[in-house]
Structures are given as structure tokens and as C-alpha cells.
From Swiss-Prot:
Family as reported in the entry's similarity comment: Belongs to the UPF0457 family.
Protein's name according to its UniProt entry: UPF0457 protein GTNG_2792
Organism: Geobacillus thermodenitrificans (strain NG80-2)
Superkingdom of origin: Bacteria
Database matches in Pfam families: bPH_8 (PF23491)
InterPro entries the UniProt entry points to: PH_SunI-like
Amino acid sequence: MMSGIKVEKLNDKLVISWLLSKIEVPISDIVKVTFDDTYGGEEKTAIRIGTPYGATDRLVILTHSNTYILFTTDAISIKNKIFSFINEQLQQK
């Protein structure tokens, strides 16, 4: 995996790790997870994670307070993981 972005669930947070960065996002804050076709992402204030190579997919995580753009070759797998974390969270309520 070229990008090396990892996502995991820690308690009620989504933890995004890349190189030396670690970002924690409360799962309950996630509004939308989607793919972004625009190069570099439409959202100018977005927090960018990963390396934006030409062939890289862009996965956008919208939360109540921030927008995160993940540049990854593994976007579908990461999106599926995030959805499963959200579903687990909903089932616990």
C-alpha cells in the first residue's frame, strides 16, 4: 500500500494515522464519507492526509467541524472500514 494511511476505531473515535501524524475524529461527528473527483479537493480549508499523486483516490470525510481529504490508493477499503465503525457506533446506542 503506497499511501500507508491507516484507520482504526478507538473507543468512540476514528483514528487516522499517516507517517508521524495521528488524527482523532469523534465518530458521532462524521456527517458524510464520499469520493472526491476534483484534483486536490474542492474544500480549500480541508485537512489533507497522504500524498496527492495523480492516480491516487481522494476520500473525503465531512464532520461537523472539519473536512478531511485522504489521498490513498486504498480508498474503497478505508471507506468500508469507516462505515463499519459508524455502524458499530450506531448499534451501541
